[in-house]
Amino acid sequence: SKASQQASEYIKLVGGAENVVDVTNCATRLRLTLKDDSIISKEEDFKAVGAHGLVHNGKAIQIIIGLSVPSVREEFENLL
């Protein structure tokens, strides 16, 4: 599915499953807490996969996805 493809790309872009501490979401964003935020890819890379943008605030990042975020989160968590 599109959601599973996006989830697998996002995991690579944030430095792999081992770099993800926590995952939540709001209405439109996948919110992640990372161990090391220095290894994540650039916002353009997230946009190339289909994200609308990236909010990077230290170890807390938000991938702006849109209303399909619950299905992307589900696939993302399955890959952790």
PLM-predicted stretches and their roles:
Residues 2-80:
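Structured cytosolic domains appended to multi-pass membrane proteins
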